[in-house]
Amino acid sequence: MRFAIVVTGPAYGTQQASSALQFAHALVNEGHELSSVFFYREGVYNANQLTSPASDEFDLVRAWQQLGAQHGVALNICVAAALRRGIVDETEAKRLALASANLQPGFSLSGLGALAEASLTCDRVVQF
């Protein structure tokens, strides 16, 4: 089966994002196709390059990055939700005259069209 995941919880503070990551790993381990993960609302914090967990804590941001790189999963961040929460790539940082960007490499800013496309092309869309 072909899956897409929607993550609406932040990297830390709730269990939504970590549960979504565990589910994503279970999918690929069972041979399913995970085409994309769409981070929406507070979920965009999973792409913040400046997140710095303590050395004895799990680094969820880098774990998402590794999932995307190892399994070819698109990591899409809702651009509107990201901008509201201060998450920007180089292009948006320049456009908005910000000092720097903080979007973790491997993630892409995208619109709700990416979520709509995933909904149309996947067998299942699971939200966390």
UniProtKB/Swiss-Prot annotation:
Belongs to the DsrE/TusD family. Heterohexamer, formed by a dimer of trimers. The hexameric TusBCD complex contains 2 copies each of TusB, TusC and TusD. The TusBCD complex interacts with TusE. The keyword Repeat does not apply. GO terms for cellular component: sulfurtransferase complex. The active site is at C78 (cysteine persulfide intermediate). InterPro entries: DsrEFH-like, Sulphur_relay_DsrE/F-like, Sulphur_relay_TusD/DsrE. It comes from Citrobacter koseri (strain ATCC BAA-895 / CDC 4225-83 / SGSC4696). Keywords: Cytoplasm, Transferase, tRNA processing. Its EC number is 2.8.1.-. GO terms for molecular function: sulfur carrier activity; sulfurtransferase activity. GO terms for biological process: tRNA wobble position uridine thiolation. Its main location: cytoplasm. Disulfide bonds: none annotated. Pfam families: DsrE. This is Sulfurtransferase TusD. It is found in: Cytoplasm. Part of a sulfur-relay system required for 2-thiolation of 5-methylaminomethyl-2-thiouridine (mnm(5)s(2)U) at tRNA wobble positions. Accepts sulfur from TusA and transfers it in turn to TusE. It is an enzyme of class 2 (transferase).
